[in-house]
Amino acid sequence: QLFSIGLVQLKMDGSPTNASNPIETYGPTDISNLARVFTGFSWDCPDHQTAPEACFKYWGTTIRPGYTDPWTVPMRAYPQFHDGASKTFLGKTVPAQTNPMETLRLSLDIIASHSNVAPFISKQLIQRFVTSNPSTGYVTRVATTFKNSSGHLGTTIKAILMDPEAR
């Protein structure tokens, strides 16, 4: 999820805020604390009511008899295995004793609201759809659309493809 913001702080045009000495967007503490968000999540095994510890065992690549393919259903949150302490990353904190699903939602909101998301994602999309070397103006226009639309991908793709530089 931290890959959504890139490695260095960016201006809206996709260039580093300090080109001569780039500022990292996150560090080891951010990574460790964000990893704690995912504690208590595992596959949705049939034993989750009677033997939840079985849901955290690695059974190999074969599926136990009587089980359906566990990789085709959403993961399940197991509150008893979730780290209930507060988690601080990217300068924001998820409060202690927040249930696993709410912790995940709040964490994704923290990442999505980071100032790097709009320019980083916009530049990546432009590079995949139109040109590998977009101008800073092109990135700024698309990043502004991304930000103003709260990250709506349909609106962002339209801005990418309808921009004069895409023609």
Regions found by a protein language model. Name each.
Residues 1-167:
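Active-site substrate-binding loop specific to GH73 endo-beta-N-acetylglucosaminidase modules
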